[in-house]
């Protein structure tokens, strides 16, 4: 099982995904709280040393008027994934002339995460995405409720 990065070990785990999950867990924490029709997201702005400047990565990014994404783990991977989420949302808007639905965005992001667990010459993303969906007032009448989602390095 150790000859390939994409081969499951006897216990049913992919070592690369385990390492990516560890990297994600060591990142700056993001807290998301859902209460009634409100979502609160918070994360400390931590600089590990006085000799290191903040990398300038936005911790929270609005993808659509209803969707906000945050990441924890490797900042470089988080930036790439946020840019991909933005691109997917823009392509959907351009193609269908409507904002992307949360389930479609989550599926696209999850597929990308999962693809990188099996892709040759690539490693899984070392970050976790927290996706907050706060639908507009009109969508509440349709039964759409606010929700918080997490996408981990395995794509789950």
Predicted segment positions?
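Long, low-complexity N-terminal extensions
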Residues: 1-156
């Amino acid at each position: 099982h150790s000859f390939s990065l994409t081969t499951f070990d006897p216990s049913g785990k992919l070592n690369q995904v385990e390492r990516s999950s560890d990297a994600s867990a060591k990142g700056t924490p993001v807290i998301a709280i859902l209460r009634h029709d409100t979502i609160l997201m918070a994360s400390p702005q931590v600089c590990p040393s006085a000799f290191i400047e903040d990398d300038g990565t936005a911790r929270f990014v609005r993808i659509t008027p209803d969707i906000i994404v945050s990441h924890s783990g490797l900042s470089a991977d988080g930036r790439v994934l946020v840019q991909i989420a933005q691109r997917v949302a823009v392509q959907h808007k351009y193609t269908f002339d409507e904002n992307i639905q949360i389930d479609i965005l989550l599926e696209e992001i999850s597929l990308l995460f999962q693809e990188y667990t099996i892709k040759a010459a690539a490693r899984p993303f070392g970050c976790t995405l927290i996706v907050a969906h706060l639908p507009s007032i009109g969508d509440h009448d349709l039964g759409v409720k606010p929700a918080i989602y997490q996408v981990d390095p395995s794509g789950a």
